[in-house]
């Protein structure tokens, strides 16, 4: 986890997004930041999982996905900012674009206090 501008970020890389256990929130971060290289055939999976991680962890999610082509694949982009309710705040579509948005940690804390689902998660240890 890193903190920047008063926001605590959990860092994920590409394929990590597929595994909810890696991003399990215990109230210790405010946003997920995921840099990725998801190919175009899996664009809907990328978009869906980014939203799912935000919803299930009651956090913001920022996903930066590759665009363009290489000999192995075409990359669709679809970078996005998603809020803790799964609503898209900004999206880049298929091109290169700088996305901006405000991660309101006060609104996030109020939502978590009103609906503290993250407290009901089972404790476990990964080995």
Regions found by a protein language model. Give the residues of each.
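C-terminal beta-strand edge segments of enzyme domains
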Residues: 1, 66-127
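Active-site beta-loop-alpha substructure in enzyme catalytic cores
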Residues: 1-63
């Amino acid at each position: 986890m890193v903190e920047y501008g008063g926001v605590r970020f959990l860092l994920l890389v590409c394929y990590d997004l597929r595994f909810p256990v890696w991003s399990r929130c215990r109230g210790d971060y405010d946003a997920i930041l995921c840099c990725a290289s998801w190919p175009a055939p899996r664009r809907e999976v990328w978009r869906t999982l980014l939203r799912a991680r935000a919803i299930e962890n009651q956090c913001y999610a920022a996903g930066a996905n590759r665009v363009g082509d290489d000999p192995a694949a075409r990359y669709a982009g679809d970078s996005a900012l998603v809020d803790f309710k799964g609503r898209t705040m900004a999206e880049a579509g298929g091109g290169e674009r700088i996305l901006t948005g405000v991660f309101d940690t006060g609104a996030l804390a109020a939502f978590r206090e009103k609906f503290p689902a993250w407290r009901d998660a089972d404790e476990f240890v990964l080995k």
